[in-house]
Amino acid sequence: MQTDPATGPLDGLVVALDIGGTKIAGALVDDEGRIRVRSQRPTPAREDDETVMGAVGDVLAELAGSPLWEAAGAVGIGSAGPVDAYRGTVSPVNVPGWRDFPLVERVHKATGGRPVTLVGDGVAMTGAEHWLGAARGHDNALCLVVSTGVGGGLVLGGRVHPGPTGNAGHIGHMVVDMDGDPCACGGRGCVERIASGPHIARRALENGWRPGPDGDVSAAAVAAAARSGDRFRPHAAVGCSRTATPGRAES
């Protein structure tokens, strides 16, 4: 567990959970967006539902060991999707053991009955960007997150728009290549299959890219190679570009 030495009022302190296919991160966050305490575990993504929930429980238990825990009044969850915010369930494509998993109910119990809000991780990220980041001051925006999967969120009319189920803007499983590779969701040619971190690296290797002396085959290494002038052509950005209309959300 990492603790920020910052001091100050604890009004508005909340428990935040970020659940993805690679890691489960948790934090106690104050009303200025500062992370006061954080915890993280690897996601046992190929294990059964209770094993994955066990990792979530470990993160929450570590946060609960902080003296700040009692001041946290609510829980916010951004989860890989799709999610169903109305029912409080999650079915992340990259965590196959969770299908209609009652995450809100389980976290509600694990946190002593605190109220829990669930949205897709892309929607949660969009809320943060609109509050404190790149979308601040913009009435309309599409924000994208590229990690183990690909997600997104929308700002419309100055407000984050999660949609009725908490998935609005989740572009990862839009089909952009009808003849593309099969996706874990059951579709073919999805954005996530083309432009997620692991698949950016995979497609770069297939198109002739070779890693440097350190052997790093991550998407970050691919991006660094592209910036340095490497002439390989993985076309990883094509999927994302096909999901957007020409021009910017705001002129």
What are these regions (language model features)?
Residues 138-194:
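Glycine-rich phosphate-binding loop of actin/hexokinase-like ATP-binding domains
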Residues 2-54, 89-90, 166:
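Short glycine-rich, Thr/Ser-proximal phosphate-binding strand/loop in the N-terminal lobe
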Residues 18, 76-80, 119, 143-149, ...:
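Short beta-strand segments
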Residues 57-65, 127-132, 238-249:
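Generic structural signal for well-ordered alpha-helical scaffold segments
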Residues 188-251:
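A mobile "lid/hinge" subdomain adjacent to the ATP/sugar-phosphate binding pocket shared
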Residues 44-45, 49-57, 61, 71-75, ...:
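Glycine-rich phosphate-binding loop and adjoining helix at the ATP-binding site
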Residues 1-11, 134-140, 187:
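Nucleotide/phosphate-binding catalytic cleft detector across ATP-hydrolyzing
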